[in-house]
Structures are given as structure tokens and as C-alpha cells.
């Protein structure tokens, strides 16, 4: 059966409206899910371990005697790594090493160090940078097991110097994924609990008798997990609420069309709501890509998902030139942006909004997903306009440092008291003035 992908032309009269329709996505809020999550959070907050145990045994069809029994010892993670097929173990270890190396360099460059300076009067100003004490990592379980996500979330936290990393992963029917457990070991995870869903998010946010409360929760999950993360935000930090995966390919027509087709598939196979778009000034090349899609789709194990994604939210867009493609790309602000062209850096300089930019025809998005090194946790749904990939900077917090000298107390006090009186806050003004007087008396003495 032929696949029907939307085809647009930027020169068309209604192009702007057509593109908006392609991009339109609003996460549906299921009232039943919201009510269930609210109840689970409240229950875990009130009953702690007992509630977590009840929900875990019910939803994952287990018969655990306690939450403590759901914690995996480090020896089990070590056994999972040892038991991997050698080639797969080597790939996982290589990916972990590359992700760690990238984030160690990122730590050096991203302002992760405290700093201060001294003014002429002896006043010291600066900033103290501190890693978070404890971070929670949510990992989907069952069939949707992604060891790469474990590495991408755990390694930057460990590189940042987070004191403790606590991972939760559901194990429906007791099924454990050795790749996920091995990735937890390589990523430096300290504790692993086999719990999931909203109850796991609640346990991490509020703490229970067994599960320690964390300062921030990271990691993907289903609609229940996303709702729970939204609700606990403020009690703890969260990484983001990610939407469906996205890829935007800018191509000048010089890349093998089958490569481009497979790159579009690489996001479409995630789920039916994923979005894959091609922008290209060469109409004949677009037709070749369309033909390659039709030829390659039947070879894909997840062809039904890919078809639904491409037909529902995909597009092949003819643009006037590559400069226009860059302008459109900035408006879309995609999660993944491939610039598959002879001169990728020329066009890359024009890109301002994208979660990750893949330069050159040999740079497939899938390499970034697994092993290039940069983080694959990226902003979606146009949030790349104001958000960044997950990184070591997400696991630091900053405190301002102020140490005022006696002379500085006089200089700053005059400014502060004047402004405080202007705002009608007399105690603020007096607090500054007392120190002005005290500093003056000390200098006289």
C-alpha cells in the first residue's frame, strides 16, 4: 500500500497555514489519568512504603513483601553487565565512555566553578556553584527499555558531582532488562528500586521509609509519569516534560535519498505522534526521497508505526533555497536538526533554535541518540527556542556570595536605605543604616 505523506511548497499561497497545521500538537490531558495520578501522589505522601508496595504489586503483578525487597544490590547490576553478549557489552561501554568524555569537557566549559572578586573597598562578591545532593532517575520498564537513556541521564549527574543517584525502573511480572541494569552500573547509579509509574515519582519526590527524597527527577515515562512529574514540580526540580520525538532534515539534494528516508524513519518509528519533516530546494530530489520511502518502508519491522507517523505528522517541503530552509527551521525549532549538505557549516551558522544540530551527510541522528557523546535528552515542541539539552549544568545550583566590608557597608548602605524608603520599607532602610553607623563608630574608635 502506497504511503501518503503531506507535500508542501513554500511558494504556495497558503504555506504558512499549512505548515502550522503540520506542526500543531497539543498533548491531550486525560481527566481519568490526572485524577488517578493525584490520588496516587497523595496516597504515597501519606502512607509512604505501604502505598508504594500496594501499587507496585498491583500494577506490575508482583508479590513483594516490602519496598526494601524491591531494591537491587550492586552485585545484580554487576552480574547484568558480566552476562551481556561481548559485542553488546563493548558497545555499551564505548557509548558510556564517549558520553562521559563529552560531559567532562562540558563541565569545564559551562561555568561549573565558583568564582568571586574583591572591590576596592574590600567588599567581596561572587557565586558559589554546588552540585545537587540527590537526583532521581526514572527509567521506563518492560518492552520500552532504553539503556541509552540511563547513560544520558546518569552520566552528566555523576560528572557534575551529584552526591547520590537513585534510579527507579518498573519490572512488570518481575521482568528485568540486563542492558538497563548494566547501563545503571556504567552510569554510576548508586541505588536501584524496581518500582515505576506515578508511585515511583511520588516516592522520589516525597521520600518514604525506604526510598530517599531527591532534589530533582529526570527521565522519560508514560502519561502517568509525565503527569506525576508536572504535579511534583516545585517540591522537586524536573528535567522537562518531553513531547513526541522530532526530526527536521535540511538537505540540498546531494545526499543519498535512501539515507534521508531512513533518517526520517528513525524518528517516525518511535511512535505515531513522532514528527519527521524534510526541507529541500530540489523538487526532483524530494521525489527520489518519496520513492525511497515507499521502497524501504516494507522492510521495517515497525512499518505500521512509521506509516502512521509519516502520514499523520510528516511532511516533504520544497523550499526556494537553503537560506529559506534555515529560516523555516528556526521557526520550527526542532528537537533534532540534520543539515545534510555539501556545506553544512555555512547553513549551520544561520541556525539559532534546535535541540541538537547534526552537520554533514555522514552525521545521522541515530549516532547522537546512542554514542556520539552529546546528550540525547532534548527540548521538543518548539521549546528549543528557550531550552537546552540535558547537561551537567542541570545538576548544579548557584548561590550568590556577598561579603561587605565596613567601608562598603557605608557606601552600599546609603544606596540601599534611599531605595528602601522609596519603597516604603523602613526596616530595610534601618537595617542598612545601623551598619552604616556601626561601621562609622568602629572607624572612629
Curated annotation (Swiss-Prot):
Binding site for NAD(+): 138, 199, 222
Pathway(s) where this gene product acts: Amino-acid biosynthesis; L-histidine biosynthesis; L-histidine from 5-phospho-alpha-D-ribose 1-diphosphate: step 9/9
GO MF assignments: histidinol dehydrogenase activity; NAD binding; zinc ion binding
Pfam families xrefs: Histidinol_dh (PF00815)
Top-level taxon: Bacteria
EC numbers, comma separated: 1.1.1.23
Stated role: Catalyzes the sequential NAD-dependent oxidations of L-histidinol to L-histidinaldehyde and then to L-histidine.
NCBIfam families for this protein: hisD (TIGR00069)
Protein name stated in the entry: Histidinol dehydrogenase
Name of the gene: hisD
Amino acid at each position: 500500500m502506497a504511503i501518503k505523506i503531506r507535500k508542501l511548497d513554500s511558494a504556495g499561497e497558503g504555506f504558512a497555514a499549512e505548515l502550522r497545521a503540520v506542526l500543531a500538537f497539543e498533548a491531550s490531558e486525560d481527566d481519568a489519568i490526572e485524577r488517578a495520578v493525584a490520588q496516587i501522589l497523595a496516597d504515597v505522601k501519606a502512607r509512604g512504603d505501604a502505598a508504594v508496595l500496594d501499587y507496585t504489586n498491583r500494577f506490575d503483578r508482583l508479590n513483594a513483601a516490602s519496598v526494601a525487597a524491591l531494591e537491587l544490590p550492586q552485585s545484580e547490576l554487576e552480574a547484568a553487565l558480566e552476562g551481556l553478549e561481548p559485542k553488546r557489552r563493548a558497545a555499551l561501554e564505548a557509548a558510556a565512555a564517549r558520553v562521559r568524555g563529552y560531559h567532562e569537557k562540558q563541565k569545564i566549559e559551562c561555568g561549573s566553578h565558583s568564582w568571586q572578586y574583591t572591590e576596592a573597598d574590600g567588599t567581596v562578591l561572587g557565586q558559589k556553584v554546588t552540585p545537587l545532593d540527590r537526583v532521581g532517575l526514572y527509567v521506563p520498564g518492560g518492552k520500552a527499555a532504553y539503556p541509552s537513556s540511563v547513560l544520558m541521564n546518569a552520566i552528566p549527574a555523576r560528572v557534575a558531582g551529584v552526591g547520590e543517584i537513585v534510579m527507579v525502573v518498573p519490572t512488570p511480572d518481575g521482568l528485568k532488562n540486563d542492558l538497563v541494569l548494566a547501563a545503571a552500573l556504567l552510569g554510576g547509579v548508586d541505588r536501584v528500586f524496581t518500582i515505576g509509574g506515578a508511585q515511583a515519582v511520588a516516592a522520589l519526590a516525597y521520600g518514604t521509609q525506604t526510598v530517599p527524597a531527591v532534589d530533582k527527577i529526570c527521565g522519560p515515562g508514560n502519561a502517568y509519569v509525565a503527569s506525576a512529574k508536572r504535579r511534583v514540580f516545585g517540591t522537586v526540580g524536573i528535567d522537562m516534560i518531553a513531547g513526541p520525538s522530532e526530526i527536521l532534515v535540511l538537505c540540498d539534494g546531494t545526499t543519498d535519498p535512501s539515507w534521508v528516508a531512513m533518517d526520517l524513519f528513525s524518528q517516525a518509528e518511535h511512535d505515531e505522534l513522532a514528527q519527521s519533516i524534510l526541507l529541500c530546494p530540489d523538487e526532483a530530489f524530494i521525489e527520489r526521497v518519496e520513492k525511497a520511502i515507499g521502497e524501504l518502508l516494507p522492510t521495517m519491522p515497525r512499518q505500521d508505526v512509521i506509516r502512521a507517523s509519516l502520514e499523520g505528522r510528516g511532511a516533504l517541503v520544497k523550499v526556494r533555497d537553503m537560506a529559506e530552509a534555515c529560516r523555516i527551521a528556526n521557526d520550527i525549532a526542532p528537537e533534532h536538526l540534520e543539515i545534510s549538505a555539501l556545506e553544512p557549516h555555512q547553513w549551520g551558522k544561520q541556525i539559532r533554535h534546535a535541540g541538537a544540530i547534526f552537520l554533514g551527510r555522514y552525521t545521522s541522528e541515530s549516532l547522537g541518540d546512542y554514542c556520539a557523546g552529546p546528550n540525547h535528552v532534548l527540548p521538543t515542541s518548539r521549546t528549543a527556542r528557550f531550552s537546552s539539552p540535558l547537561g551537567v549544568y542541570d545538576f548544579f545550583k548557584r548561590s550568590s556570595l556577598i561579603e561587605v566590608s565596613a567601608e562598603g557597608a557605608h557606601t552600599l548602605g546609603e544606596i540601599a536605605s534611599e531605595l528602601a524608603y522609596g519603597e516604603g520599607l523602613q526596616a530595610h532602610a534601618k537595617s542598612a543604616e545601623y551598619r552604616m553607623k556601626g561601621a562609622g563608630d568602629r572607624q572612629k574608635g
